From Swiss-Prot:
Protein task: May have a role in assembly and/or activation of benzylsuccinate synthase.
Record flagged with keyword Nucleotide-binding: yes
A GO biological process held by the record: catabolic process
Source organism of this protein record: Thauera aromatica
Keyword DNA-binding: no
Binding site for ATP: 47-54, 108-115
Keywords linked to the UniProt accession: Aromatic hydrocarbons catabolism, ATP-binding, Chaperone, Nucleotide-binding
Gene: bssE
UniProt protein name: Putative chaperone BssE
Amino acid sequence: MKNSGLLNSVHVPAADPYYYLNTETLSLLNRIQRISQKHPVNVLVIGKQGCGKSSLVRQYAAVHHLPLATFQIGLLSEPGQLFGEYALENGETRYKQFLFPQAIQTPGCVIHLEEINRPEHPKALNMLFSILSDDRQVWMDELGLLKVADGVVFFATLNEGDEFVGTELLDPALRDRFYVTAMDFLPNDVEREVLQKKTGVTIAQAEEIIGVVNSLRASPELGVEVSTRKTLMIGEMIAAGGSLREAIAASLQTDRETLESVLLSLHVELGKTERGTTEYVLFTPR
């Protein structure tokens, strides 16, 4: 596996000026920050796809001016793969260290273990047990003794549910090492405000989008779940001049039959009269 494919660079992210969080979760994060000043701490963030789990981790790092390192756990297929790999270099086999060992030894680093329940092989997480335990250290023949630095906060995020292909149930022994917080979609009034500020749609357009989103979320038989991320995508498409139909068709990842069912449902429930017309034109350099 290539290093660049496993992780993103360490940096202090910019804060989102329109990031909203419920007071209960905010209170928990404040306590996590205090605990981290005494010793490293682990937090598991669970919730539906696209409800802002990764944004929460990024905003925590931004608010506290801490470096953030993100690791895609879904790319792991064997133990130790987070730490490095053997590679052929100038005709010799050498061990190439990845960013993870550096990140865990950086004081105050926020480490995001993204989709922790989706490794390619369950045993790929074995070496995390020691890192996330009270011991906070692991021995590797290639790197020696690695100790987690003071102030490090591990955030693990996961989508729970049978609808996520490749998702493994998180090992109870691993889960036991985390504080847990759950996230859900934003309330309508907050989601409406975020939609306006982040995408630039008008108040009327935001109201219309939220109405459509509520209708879809209240119709599980359609098999379409509209996340906050998707809501923002719909808003951006409309702000760029697209129609509601165009925005829905382009933003919802579903097959044509389901899409037609969704559009028909919206037409019946909300009285939407937009009609789709397909015309083919040349798409060539001018």
